[in-house]
């Protein structure tokens, strides 16, 4: 069981992560094996190209970041669906760090559209970049994973990096426990737009 001081939303995320990390894989995607082992599988599209499947490789016990790795070595480090670092992409992110609160930690609870969040980004585009983000609710949509279709809250992230004159809307689909199941993200202009789905997702069953 993951320890530490966690919010209610983050505890749900941590419980889900615990279930996934029990099977730590770096293998070719196998639907039967995924279902039998409860393995973490991320379905990813980069720049609108075909889907690739990335296996859950490891969990950082200090930050609770999940590292998903593809067969060709591309890595996405994520905290509750939010990209925190990448490896072996055309342009990589070294780190994304929250500076004033973190809606992904809080499980998207009590978000106000007027509240601004700040993120420090370290990447090849520049050191010490700061992104500004606001979040607004955009309704409920049905998202399909390997285990079924689920009604999820759609949140739009208005993301901007003033130093690069860059603005974009990123999208997150979140379950009732605050877990990000699907996202569309492009943190910086020299990165490809990433469409990410936690393909192995199924709702956490509470006792």
Language-model features and meaning:
Residues 2-4:
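C-terminal motif of bacterial Sec signal peptides marking the signal peptidase cleavage site
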Residues 6-95, 110-207:
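Acidic, serine/threonine-rich low-complexity disordered tracts
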Residues 101-103:
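A small/polar (G/S/T-enriched), proline-flanked helix-loop surface module common
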């Amino acid at each position: 069981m993951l320890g530490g001081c966690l919010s209610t939303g983050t505890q749900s995320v941590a419980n889900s992560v615990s279930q996934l990390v029990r099977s730590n894989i770096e293998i070719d995607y196998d639907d039967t094996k995924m279902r039998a082992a409860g393995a973490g599988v991320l379905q990813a599209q980069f720049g609108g190209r075909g889907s690739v499947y990335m296996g859950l490789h490891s969990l950082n016990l200090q930050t609770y970041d999940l590292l998903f790795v593809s067969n060709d070595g591309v890595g996405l480090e994520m905290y509750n669906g939010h990209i925190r670092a990448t490896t072996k992409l055309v342009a990589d992110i070294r780190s994304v760090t929250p500076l004033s609160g973190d809606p992904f930690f809080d499980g998207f609870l009590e978000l106000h559209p007027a509240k601004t969040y700040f993120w420090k980004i370290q990447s090849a585009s520049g050191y010490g970049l700061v992104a500004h983000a606001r979040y607004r609710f955009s309704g409920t949509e049905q998202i399909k994973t390997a285990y079924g279709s689920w009604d999820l809250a759609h949140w739009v992230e208005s993301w901007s990096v003033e130093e690069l004159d860059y603005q974009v809307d990123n999208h997150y689909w979140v379950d009732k426990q605050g877990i990000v199941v699907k996202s569309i993200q492009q943190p910086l202009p020299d990165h490809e737009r990433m469409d990410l789905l936690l393909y192995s997702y199924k709702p956490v069953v509470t006792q």
